[in-house]
Curated annotation (Swiss-Prot):
Annotated region (Disordered), positions in chain: 43-83, 95-147, 333-365
Functional summary from the UniProt entry: Component of the SWR1 complex which mediates the ATP-dependent exchange of histone H2A for the H2A variant H2A.F/Z leading to transcriptional regulation of selected genes (e.g. FLC) by chromatin remodeling.
Pfam families attached to this UniProt entry: YL1, YL1_C
InterPro entries: Vps72/YL1_C (IPR013272), YL1_N (IPR046757)
Protein name: SWR1 complex subunit 2
Residues that span the membrane, as ranges: none
Biased composition (Basic and acidic residues): 118-132
UniProt source species: Arabidopsis thaliana (Mouse-ear cress)
Top-level taxon: Eukaryota
An individual GO BP term: cell differentiation
One GO CC term, this protein: Swr1 complex
Residue stretches of biased makeup (Basic residues): 99-108
Keywords: Coiled coil, Developmental protein, Differentiation, Flowering
């Protein structure tokens, strides 16, 4: 079914209360007060003569009044900036917040040691103290924000300072003042003294001059290098126009310098035992030998000629290798005593003979 007519709204009756809407009205009133307090601040008030803001005027090509004036001095500009900085700044206070109070700067009072003489009375002292306290309070109000130097009142610091002053005064008293000569107090020399001093300086200058000249001569001698010049007979070789020439100078001749005789060949060493061409030479005796047997014979003959040295003297490393004993591991070199007998080439002739003198003597016996 369609309802053509709307049903009327039914309102329920409520019991009235004494505190009904009390909180809401209080909140609304607080909001209105905060709103008025915010918009009535000094920062938001319009000033009658606002220097910072001026309405723009439609004026063309206008110059300021101070266009032709000189620029202000920097000191004056600095003073104006300082005054502008010192002006109190306007700040916005938002609703629901309280303005912050300025903190007063604490000033430190200079404490000084006071000396109280014995003649003053206690009543007068109290009066003087009160006056001094009043003056100090006034000075504190005038000197807000200024820094005051603090002095220590400890007795130890004062005593140390007094000791330093006394020590400094004692040092200054003991030090002797520097006596400076006056310009007019210089001693004037007589004519005789001046002549004597001139003679002494002349002698010293001559000695120094001699030393300098001697040093220069030594340096010059060292600088000059004398090359040795050959002045004997010379043969010079010249090549000119495709021809070679020999020039004999200073007593040189063709026959004297160019000899046609052949140089004889050096004689070949022969083994003293076998007579064959020697390839080796004994380092101890200096005799040439060709074979190992010849070397053994030379050493044995050498040991036989030197009586009593066979036991004291070794045959040597070379002899050991030839005998096939090999080198000793660690052997000290034996010292050979000096003897007046010398092994000559004449003794080598005995090796060629089949029998020596000793053997013939033994046969005769």
């Amino acid at each position: 079914m369609e309802i053509d007519e709307e049903e009327p709204m039914v309102f329920l009756d409520r019991t009235t209360r004494a505190t009904r809407g009390k909180r809401m009205t209080k909140l609304l009133d607080d909001e209105v007060e905060e709103d008025e307090q915010f918009w009535n601040q000094e920062a938001l008030k319009e000033e009658e003569h606002d220097d910072e803001y001026e309405a723009e005027r439609e004026v063309a090509d206008e110059f300021d009044s101070d266009f032709n004036d000189d620029e202000p001095e920097p000191d004056a500009v600095a003073v104006n900036e300082k005054e502008l900085r010192d002006l109190p700044k306007k700040r916005l206070i938002y609703p629901g917040k309280t303005a912050s109070k300025k903190k007063k700067k604490k000033t430190k009072v200079v404490s000084q040691l006071e000396y109280i003489p014995g003649d003053e009375k206690p009543g007068e002292e109290l009066g003087n103290k009160e006056q001094e306290e009043k003056e100090e309070n006034e000075a504190q109000e005038d000197m807000e924000g200024e820094k005051v130097i603090r002095k220590s009142t400890r007795t130890s610091v004062v005593v140390r300072q007094a000791e330093r002053d006394a020590l400094r005064a004692a040092i200054q008293a003991t030090t002797k003042p520097i006596q400076r000569k006056k310009v007019g107090e210089e001693k004037r020399m007589t004519q005789e003294e001046m002549l004597l001093e001139a003679a002494q300086t002349e002698i010293m200058n001559l000695r120094n001059l001699e030393r300098v000249l001697a040093r220069e001569e030594e340096v010059k001698k060292k600088a000059i290098v004398h090359k040795a010049v050959y002045k004997g007979p010379q043969i010079r070789y010249h090549s000119k126009d495709g021809c070679n020439y020999l020039e004999f100078c200073n007593g040189a001749s063709f026959n004297s310098e160019l000899s046609t005789k052949s140089v004889p060949y050096p004689e070949k060493a022969v083994c003293v035992i076998t007579g064959l061409p020697a390839k080796y030479r004994d380092p101890k005796t200096g005799l040439p030998y060709a074979t190992r047997d010849a070397f053994k014979a030379i050493r044995e003959r050498f040991m036989d000629e030197h009586d009593g040295l066979r036991k004291k003297m070794e045959m040597g490393d070379l002899f050991d290798t030839l005998v096939a004993k090999g080198f000793a591991t660690k052997q000290k070199r034996t010292k050979i005593p000096k003897s007046n007998k010398s092994f000559s080439l004449r003794s080598s002739a005995r090796f060629l003979s089949s029998e020596s003198e000793e053997e013939s003597e033994e046969d005769s016996d």
